[in-house]
């Protein structure tokens, strides 16, 4: 038995889906353990290009079982739409290869509405939410006022529970935001419409994973977002509302804490960020637009242009430490091929003092990047499949990052397709 977590080291959008699609062939099960449809994992394979927001990236591999764990929050309407789009593209999805935890939490339409209402109230102080209802539903979960997927299978129980919750939610919707209340019959009809389609996939995934482990199956745990968006260790409050930490895989999937023995951290060869909050090495203007265009940096979930900049080694080293990464996959190295010189953020300067340490949230916005530059390679590397065939400048860049973050880089992607990578 060998279990692996695939996690983001930075702000998310590092290329986790692409690496899961590559590495998952070594595993029997791929399990998403946190988050909702607020971020997307982009996968390019023989079926086409897909942006997955809930379904694990192992869904394209025959013989691999894909699981949404208890730590995931699920918008029924979105999940069914995602499943249908995959099935329409010829991807097989059955209760045998896709399972949904009965303990996963449902994101209701009123959660989405509350997300938008709160962002509107905050105005220029907003957090940059994706407006998918994630913060409201996790807030409700910890107040024990949410509905679990398994409750869809018990209509009378669901009706009783939802009636009490909706009465409470409408107090906030009406009295705080002055918006129209939600009707119980409408919410029950929504549950029936989409819950009936999803019912065959809902089961006790904790028991399924337990039995799978016991029989020697290998499990991969797929995270959403990255260390700097983690609710505990990220740049608070500009974080997600769940833990994107590798350590949460055990909680969000329901397995013992000692059972993850490999953690692959995903790092992009430059920095990107979607949403608000400090982003120390950020570029602006023509410089940023050139990098954004070269890397096609637009959010998979929102379509928003991503904020971009050079790789930030201070933030990356912190992410490696927080995630406990045992190895690194460096993605999108090919994007930097247009640069004659490649800037690298090696330190921060705060109040005149240079530091290698990632600072506490209260002062991170005051940090200024300290850059060095490295020679570019100036040629297309997307056809390279062996480490020794990379230009020496590209190898030097990878090795410089590896030394700075203190973790071996075992994979280097040089393109979006499944086979466009180098294993060291």
Predicted segments — roles?
Residues 1-424:
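Non-transmembrane, aqueous-exposed alpha-helical and coiled segments at domain scale
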